[in-house]
């Protein structure tokens, strides 16, 4: 069906262990159905830093920093078959992982 196409999957998560496990599940599922897989390719980690005052009233010089790291991975599935697409649709990933799929 999708002989000359490729499926590009981008995964995002705050926890890199959860992200790597989900990427491994996708790679294993795609390879079992006979598709070629490129990746997982680690993309740059986005770091959002938030600076807040420690005290509620005075001491502007005393601050605290928090950060949120967003880890990303990229997977390309080359020459997917119909069985590959069906298996990926049925795959249940962890709830903390955001998946973007482009065909």
Swiss-Prot record:
A GO molecular function held by the record? structural constituent of ribosome
Q: Name one GO cellular component term.
A: ribonucleoprotein complex
InterPro entries in alphabetical order: Ribosomal_uS10, Ribosomal_uS10_CS, Ribosomal_uS10_dom, Ribosomal_uS10_dom_sf
Q: Does the keyword Ribosomal protein apply?
A: yes
Report if keyword Ribonucleoprotein is assigned: yes
Q: Which residues cross the membrane?
A: none
Q: Which UniProt keywords apply?
A: Ribonucleoprotein, Ribosomal protein
One biological process term in Gene Ontology: translation
Disulfide-bonded cysteine pairs: these are none
**What does this protein's UniProt record list under function?**
Involved in the binding of tRNA to the ribosomes.
* Subunit structure of this chain's protein: Part of the 30S ribosomal subunit.
User: What family does this belong to?
Assistant: Belongs to the universal ribosomal protein uS10 family.
Protein's recorded name: Small ribosomal subunit protein uS10
Q: Which organism is it from?
A: Desulfatibacillum aliphaticivorans
Q: Which gene encodes it?
A: rpsJ
């Amino acid at each position: 069906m999708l002989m000359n196409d490729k499926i590009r999957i981008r995964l995002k998560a705050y926890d890199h262990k959860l992200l790597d496990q989900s990427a491994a599940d996708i790679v294993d599922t795609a390879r079992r159905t006979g598709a070629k897989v490129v990746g997982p390719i680690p993309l740059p980690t986005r770091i959002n830093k938030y600076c807040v005052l420690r005290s509620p009233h005075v001491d502007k010089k005393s601050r605290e920093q928090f950060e949120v790291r967003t880890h990303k991975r990229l997977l390309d599935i080359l020459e997917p078959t119909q069985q590959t697409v069906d298996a990926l649709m049925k795959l249940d990933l962890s709830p903390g992982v955001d998946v973007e799929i482009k065909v």
